[in-house]
UniProtKB/Swiss-Prot annotation:
Bias (Basic and acidic residues) ranges: 7-17
Subcellular location(s) of the protein: Cytoplasm
Region spans: Disordered: 1-31, 396-416
Keywords in alphabetical order: Cytoplasm, Neurogenesis, Phosphoprotein
Name recorded for this polypeptide: Nuclear receptor-binding protein 2
Main location: cytoplasm
GO terms under cellular component: cytoplasm
Residues with PTM Phosphothreonine: T407, T409
UniProt family annotation: Belongs to the protein kinase superfamily. Ser/Thr protein kinase family.
Species name: Mus musculus
Length: 499
């Protein structure tokens, strides 16, 4: 007969349960009620200047997020620069890239007792790159070269995006502690707001932002010119090179809690067996910032460059135009498909052609691949850069909204932050025969279905209608051109049927 469990152990379990319940307690809510702050604190990159980061819940999407608080001691100085602070966060809210931790929302909380900015960011639960590398080394495993290339490509994709903004966004705090890796291999860069906070805040508000370098153990991630007036995007390239070196060797040994020495970095460089990888990393770590390549050029280095497969190109094309297709298009197409039919064939000089049939395609693997491409794990790099994001972008609220901004907990602006993944519309004559009745269905990326109806004249512009939907917060700014083209095509087809 088993002995009864000791009472102290049961007591410890009850204590752990109580602690877990305490951590899930809701301490505070956002003004709109969507974000709920919990007691549990999280570490998402040791962001200097952020006094507290808590786990929070997004009650609309049912996912965990991070609740960040930036505190200001001088209440009067904060009030004097409130507009500049809002503009700074509006700029950050525009930064949208699959390999960058997303800033979802922000608001100001200014009372007689305190002044703070609260902003909600994406939560990456799988941990930092440094934690992953330590775990890999502890398990006596070597770094897979293919994984190294994939991670470098994703990090450079994010840096190329930031540096292509106008003006360029310099990360300024890129280390293996501020790079996160998800369970599916997706890389996310955090603390993008570090440099903007350090440089954009006025001198009298600079006190909560520690502009000095990170703790000693991370000093080796920063180049010699770091902190100088004229430093630029090359700062991030040096930091990336050190991250790439650490990923390749798993760990650069430090002397206890002190900084990593030049000798340790040299030993790590010499341990690289691949000459292309060594040359790639050394070009990033050049002492002269003018000799470091740009993030975009590094993507074309021979150690990373590869010709994209037709499968990957087709996947990106499919995802970019998925908004034109029904939600269950893949399922419907495969139902009507003859699985024994030939999908493709390759002629052989001697003998019959090599054939692939639909039955050889794993639709489950195909769905997973499409999801990975959609999430940003396989970016397209061998093409011209997309139109750069223009910053700063001044969002002028209506007068009544500007008045609200002076209240303790304002909502800065109401704009749609979710992208459209599917569009459908129907046109028919209205009862008076002079107008068209438009029914528009928009499926957003969180699967929200938004159905809109509108009576319009045949002479109305698709561009004006799309702009109006953006203005009233029904459509993301990035989807305006896409929707306008979709509506224009629909209008032309409908006019043809009425002729």
């Amino acid at each position: 007969m088993a002995a009864p469990e000791p009472a102290p152990r049961r007591g410890r379990e009850r204590e752990r349960e109580d602690e877990s319940e305490d951590e899930s307690d809701i301490l505070e809510e956002s003004p709109c009620g969507r974000w709920q702050k919990r007691r549990e604190q999280v570490n998402q990159g040791n962001m200097p200047g952020i006094q507290s980061t808590f786990l929070a819940m997004d009650t609309e999407e049912g996912v965990e997020v991070v609740w960040n608080e930036l505190h200001f001691g001088d209440r009067k100085a904060f009030a004097a620069h409130e507009e500049k602070i809002q503009t700074m966060f509006e700029q950050l809210a525009l930064v949208d890239h699959p390999n960058i931790v997303k800033l979802h929302k922000y608001w100001l909380d200014a009372s007689e007792a305190r002044a703070r900015v609260i902003f909600i960011t994406e939560y990456v639960s799988s941990g930092s790159l440094k934690q992953f590398l330590k775990k890999t080394k502890k398990n006596h495993k070597a770094m897979n070269a293919r994984a190294w290339k994939r991670w470098c490509t994703q990090i450079l994709s994010a840096l190329s995006f930031l540096h292509a903004c106008s003006p360029p966004i310099i990360h300024g705090n890129l280390t293996s502690d501020t790079i996160f890796i998800q369970h599916n291999g997706l890389i996310k860069i955090g603390s993008v707001w570090y440099r903007i906070f350090s440089n954009a805040l006025p001198d009298d508000l600079r006190s909560p932002i520690r502009a000095e370098r990170e703790e000693l153990r991370n000093l080796h991630f920063f180049p010699p010119e770091y902190g100088e007036v004229n430093d630029g995007t090359a700062v991030d390239i040096f930091s990336f090179g050190m991250c790439a070196l650490e990923m390749a060797v798993l760990e650069i040994q430090a002397n206890g809690d002190t900084r990593v020495t030049e000798e340790a970095i040299a030993r790590a460089r010499h341990s690289l067996s691949d000459p292309n990888m060594r040359e790639f990393i050394l070009s990033c770590l050049a002492r002269d910032p003018a000799r470091r390549p740009s993030a975009h050029n590094l993507l074309f280095h021979r150690v990373l460059f590869e010709v994209h497969s037709l499968k990957l190109l087709a996947a990106h094309c499919f995802i970019q135009h998925q908004y034109l297709m029904p939600e269950n298009v893949v399922e419907e197409k495969t139902k009507a498909m003859d699985l024994h039919a030939v999908l493709a064939e390759m002629p052989q000089p001697h003998g019959p052609p090599m054939q692939w049939r639909y039955s050889e395609v794993s639709f489950l693997e195909l769905d997973k691949f499409l999801e990975d491409v959609r999430n940003g794990i396989y970016p397209l790099m061998n093409f011209a850069a997309a139109r750069p994001l223009g910053l700063p972008r001044v969002l002028a609220p209506p007068p009544e909204e500007a008045q609200k901004a002076k209240t303790p907990t304002p909502e800065p602006f109401d704009s749609e932050t979710r992208k459209v993944v599917q569009m459908q519309c129907n046109l028919e004559r209205s009862e008076d025969k002079a107008r068209w009745h438009l029914t528009l269905l928009l499926v957003l990326e969180d699967r929200l279905h938004r159905q809109l109806t509108y009576d319009l004249l045949p002479t109305d512009s698709a561009q004006d209608l799309a702009a109006e939907l953006v203005h009233y917060g029904f459509l993301h700014e990035d989807d305006r051109t896409k929707l306008a083209a979709f509506l224009e095509t629909t209008f032309l087809k409908y006019r043809g049927t009425q002729a």
